[in-house]
Amino acid sequence: PNPSPMSRKQAFQFLDLPRTMPTRIPVELRTSGDWGELYGKFDKAEAQYQSGRCLDCGNPYCSWKCPVHNAIPQWLQLVQENRIEEAAALCHSTNPLPEVCGRVCPQDRLCEGSCTLEEFGAVTIGAVEKYIVDTAFKMGWRPDLGNVHPTGHRVAVIGAGPAGLACADRLARAGIEAVVYDRYEQIGGLLQFGIPSFKLDKSVIGKRREILEGLGGRV
């Protein structure tokens, strides 16, 4: 049977909701000493607008193509409902560095490139992920390990690059104290010294250090 006018409208509503990106900082500002991140951030309305474009596919290719299999449709739904802290917790459950991936991950070849809407303009997944974590941190949210029981074990992690930080995060979630060693005072490795500030502001890495120490890790 032919679909009703209402169901047809709902099925194709994404055609009326175009893909949008955060504001790109003007060249004039970027060449006058502002070496901050190239793109701004979504506000609440923009993040909810983009999240609302998600079709909630039965077989979400965005999650499948994501190397860490983020629960993307689920946290997009939480953003629509303004449940930011829950969205941040869900992001952290699969990804120890979501604030980094929201900025520098090649979404066009991974989650966004696999979005069912890609032909019409994929959901701006990376920008929403950045919004979730930055907003949650600003609200004072931190990962909750209240249900984790300390094992009394301590593990040394050599290198405070992305892999070392991710390892320390997962150890903390298993109740193991991680002590991270690095030759440099600043943590981050490639994130700190290899990725320019216009892609990844270094304050983001400083915040990750604070989070790690809050989880009981030491650097």
Summary of predicted features, one role per range:
Residues 96, 161-162, 186:
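Residue-level detector of alpha-helix initiation sites
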Residues 176-192:
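Glycine-rich FAD pyrophosphate-binding loop
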Residues 1-154:
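Ferredoxin-type iron-sulfur electron-transfer modules and their immediate structural context
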Residues 138, 166, 176, 201, ...:
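N-terminal export/assembly segments and adjacent metallocofactor-ligating motifs
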Residues 153-179:
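N-terminal Rossmann-like FAD-binding beta1-loop-alpha1 element of flavoenzymes
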Residues 88-98, 128, 191-219:
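N-terminal Rossmann-like dinucleotide/flavin-binding domain of flavoprotein oxidoreductases
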